[in-house]
Amino acid sequence: MVVLKPDKIGDADFANYFCTYGYLYHQKDMLEDQKRMTAYHDSVRLNPKQFKDKVVLDVGTGSGILAIWAAQCGARKVYAVEATYMAVHARKLVAANGLENVVEVSLFLFVYLYFRTSIWAIRLTDVVFLYP
């Protein structure tokens, strides 16, 4: 695993931002926010044509719920990227939904996707970006 070391100036901000999202209680709070989840659910589940046979990049996947919904809407492949160890829980949820062949959960920061040439070899018109 490659770990990104932040600049010295922003160490505290970087650590505080990412450590908060790494706890289950924080994910639970977001999942229980009915307005948030209804908006996300409707934007994905009510627009299956936007996801059918597409490649989806879910940056900051957290629990993986958006990645799961995208896969359920027919996405060909979903790259679910998470910078915290919440990725471990997201992988379990993806597997529990039987989607591990479609959803790939990765524990690393977005910058490292530049090295994953398989993503960028796909026409951009076939890529859907999920970034809440």
Residues covered by each model-derived region:
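Intrinsically disordered, low-complexity glycine/charged-rich regulatory or linker segments
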Residues: 1-28, 32, 38
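Conserved alpha-helix/loop element of class I SAM-dependent methyltransferases that forms part
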Residues: 35-54
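Conserved class I S-adenosyl-L-methionine
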Residues: 52-62
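Conserved SAM-binding loop of SAM-dependent methyltransferases across substrates and taxa
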Residues: 63-76
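Conserved SAM-binding motif I beta-strand of class I
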Residues: 77-83
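Conserved short alpha-helix immediately C-terminal to the canonical SAM/SAH-binding motif I
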Residues: 85-89
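S-adenosyl-L-methionine
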Residues: 91-112, 118
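N-terminal low-complexity segments that are often proline-rich with Ser/Thr-Pro
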Residues: 112-131
